[in-house]
Amino acid sequence: MEVNILAVIATALFIIIPTSFLLILYVKTASQADS
């Protein structure tokens, strides 16, 4: 099965971007709660 590189990159970005956004948002709220 031939893998489409653009499809792999698009899927990776589609997963990584929201995940990193939620992670940063969680870290911000956690740091605010600590202080």
Swiss-Prot record:
Picking any one GO biological process from the record gives: photosynthesis, light reaction
The record describes its membrane topology as:
Single-pass membrane protein
Keywords on record: Chloroplast, Membrane, Photosynthesis, Photosystem II, Plastid, Reaction center, Thylakoid, Transmembrane, Transmembrane helix
Fetch the Pfam families from UniProt. Answer: PsbM
For this protein, the record's InterPro entries field holds: PSII_PsbM (IPR007826), PSII_PsbM_sf (IPR037269)
UniProt-annotated location(s): Plastid, Chloroplast thylakoid membrane
Segments passing through the bilayer: 5-25
Q: Which domain of life is it from?
A: Eukaryota
Q: One GO CC annotation, please? A: chloroplast thylakoid membrane
Q: NCBIfam families annotated for this entry? A: PS_II_psbM
| Family of the protein in this entry | Belongs to the PsbM family.
Q: Per its database record, what is this protein's job?
A: One of the components of the core complex of photosystem II (PSII). PSII is a light-driven water:plastoquinone oxidoreductase that uses light energy to abstract electrons from H(2)O, generating O(2) and a proton gradient subsequently used for ATP formation. It consists of a core antenna complex that captures photons, and an electron transfer chain that converts photonic excitation into a charge separation. This subunit is found at the monomer-monomer interface.
Q: Which HAMAP family match?
A: PSII_PsbM (MF_00438)
Provide the assembly information.
PSII is composed of 1 copy each of membrane proteins PsbA, PsbB, PsbC, PsbD, PsbE, PsbF, PsbH, PsbI, PsbJ, PsbK, PsbL, PsbM, PsbT, PsbX, PsbY, PsbZ, Psb30/Ycf12, at least 3 peripheral proteins of the oxygen-evolving complex and a large number of cofactors. It forms dimeric complexes.
Name of the protein: Photosystem II reaction center protein M
